[in-house]
């Protein structure tokens, strides 16, 4: 089956690998040549991923039978709508359904309208004075969010990126003047986690839970990035998450998909809920209308099923199952020095693939070209899969040593110390649970 994959990051390399393993004849459109995908693809179209016309032309040329959309920007550009008009089914929501991610205000209002569990208190402002007055009256720490896509880097939280509510008002004013509107939310304290599901618009199949490390530097400090790494556990939960917490988070996504169908925006593809586990339970931080990056790499590394068959089930409305191995995973992203604010670009790195393989680790390429030249974003990920988290972390850590150049990574991704730190946060919030160190 001829399958088109849109996107060329680490997430897409992992998707492409799984599709080819499932028997797909792969064709890729991306704005750079990912060396991992180049080995997998029958043909590779270089084009802007949001240029719908170019993507459609490429799909026509090769007689594509199914498309799989990796990143969020093409979804916002209406790539799925255009492909479907061409008679090409796509794994990914339409432009209208993708608003769950692409328009944060719409998503919050949708949750409110449909009484979706895990909601946060929020307000949307287009008037600077009203916004300032409301924040003063509210008096508690807030979160400030632009309404559209920011690559995970536009959200600022009081007590983290913002010193206090005074700074929050300044930042919110800047967004109103730039975009016309701003979203203000209550701050929720706790530990974040990711739940991703496959859905055909009715049936919902959860994937193992994953925890991401968004901060650039060890100890969870520094600027927010696209994600410096992530881990998952062999029991598909996380050390601080009970079966009950998981069920509640899943209910949020199930009710979301049901409400989208009722509102006339059937949602098919991957839905990813970014949750905060608070003392009271899981609260939805935001929806994403596609796989997470790095989180896709974790779950696809343990997918014990055929991704091509799952993709067909999604587009045909006949989704049945998705099995995952009971293994732990650790993904460590390697980024250019200076990332995310001022990354080094244009310099080649050295990758000893044989050495990485001999350690039992796996390499996933991201923002490097076919010559392994740094393109300015996260360059590649090293993946460890094992029976225990400790062993998976050791494999990934050993694999990293075979990559040389002006790069950095977070040593603490998936380590026992960093996991225990998260368990401690939940205990301080009064959460009662029996931690498992997977």
Curated annotation (Swiss-Prot):
Mn(2+) 1 binds at residues 274, 286. SMART domains: GARS_A (SM01209), GARS_C (SM01210). Mg(2+) 2 binds at residues 286, 288. Keywords: ATP-binding, Ligase, Magnesium, Manganese, Metal-binding, Nucleotide-binding, Purine biosynthesis. Binds 2 magnesium or manganese ions per subunit. ATP binds at residues 135-194. One of its GO terms (biological process) is purine nucleobase biosynthetic process. The keyword Nucleotide-binding applies. PROSITE patterns: ATP_GRASP, GARS. It catalyses: 5-phospho-beta-D-ribosylamine + glycine + ATP = N(1)-(5-phospho-beta-D-ribosyl)glycinamide + ADP + phosphate + H(+). One of its GO terms (molecular function) is phosphoribosylamine-glycine ligase activity. It is an enzyme of class 6 (ligase). Its cofactor is Mg(2+); Mn(2+). Its EC number is 6.3.4.13. Mg(2+) 1 binds at residues 274, 286. NCBIfam families: purD. This is Phosphoribosylamine--glycine ligase. It comes from Pyrococcus horikoshii (strain ATCC 700860 / DSM 12428 / JCM 9974 / NBRC 100139 / OT-3). The gene is purD.
């Amino acid at each position: 089956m001829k399958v088109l994959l849109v996107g060329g990051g680490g997430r897409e390399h992992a998707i492409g690998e799984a599709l080819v393993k499932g028997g797909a004849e792969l064709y890729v459109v991306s704005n750079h040549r990912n060396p991992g995908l180049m080995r997998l693809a029958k043909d590779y179209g270089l084009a802007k991923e949001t240029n719908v016309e170019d993507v459609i032309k490429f799909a026509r040329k090769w007689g594509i039978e199914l498309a799989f959309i990796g990143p969020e920007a093409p979804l916002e550009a209406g790539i799925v709508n255009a492909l479907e008009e061409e008679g090409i089914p796509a794994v990914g929501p339409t432009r209208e359904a993708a608003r769950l991610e692409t328009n944060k205000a719409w998503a919050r209002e949708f949750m409110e309208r449909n009484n979706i569990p895990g909601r946060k208190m929020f307000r949307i402002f287009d008037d600077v004075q009203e916004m300032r007055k409301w924040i003063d009256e509210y008096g508690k720490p807030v979160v400030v969010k632009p309404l559209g896509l920011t690559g995970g880097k536009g959200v600022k939280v009081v007590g983290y990126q913002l010193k206090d509510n005074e700074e929050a008002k300044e930042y919110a004013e800047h967004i109103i003047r730039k975009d016309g509107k701003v979203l203000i939310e209550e701050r929720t304290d706790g530990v974040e986690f990711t739940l991703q599901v496959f859905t055909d618009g009715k049936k919902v199949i959860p994937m193992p839970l994953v925890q991401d490390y968004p901060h650039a530097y060890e100890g969870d400090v520094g600027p927010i990035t696209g994600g410096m790494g992530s881990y998952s556990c062999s029991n598909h939960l996380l050390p601080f998450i009970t079966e009950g917490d998981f069920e509640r988070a899943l209910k949020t996504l199930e009710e979301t998909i049901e409400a989208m169908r009722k509102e006339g925006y059937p949602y098919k593809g991957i839905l990813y809920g970014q949750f905060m586990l608070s003392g009271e339970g899981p609260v939805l931080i935001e929806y994403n209308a596609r796989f997470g990056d790095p989180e896709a790499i974790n779950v696809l590394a343990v997918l014990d099923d055929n991704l091509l068959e799952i993709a067909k089930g999604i587009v045909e409305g006949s989704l049945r199952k998705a099995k995952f191995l009971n293994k732990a995973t650790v993904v460590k992203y390697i980024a250019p020095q200076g990332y995310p604010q001022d990354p080094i670009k244009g310099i080649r790195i050295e990758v000893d693939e044989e050495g990485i393989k001999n350690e039992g680790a796996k390499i996933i390429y991201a923002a490097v070209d076919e010559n392994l030249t740094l393109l300015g974003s996260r360059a590649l990920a090293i993946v460890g899969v094992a029976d225990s988290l400790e062993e998976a972390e050791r494999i990934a850590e050993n694999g990293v040593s075979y990559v040389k150049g002006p790069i950095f990574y977070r040593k603490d991704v998936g380590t026992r110390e960093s996991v225990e730190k998260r368990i401690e946060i939940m205990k301080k919030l009064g959460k009662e649970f029996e931690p498992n160190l997977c």
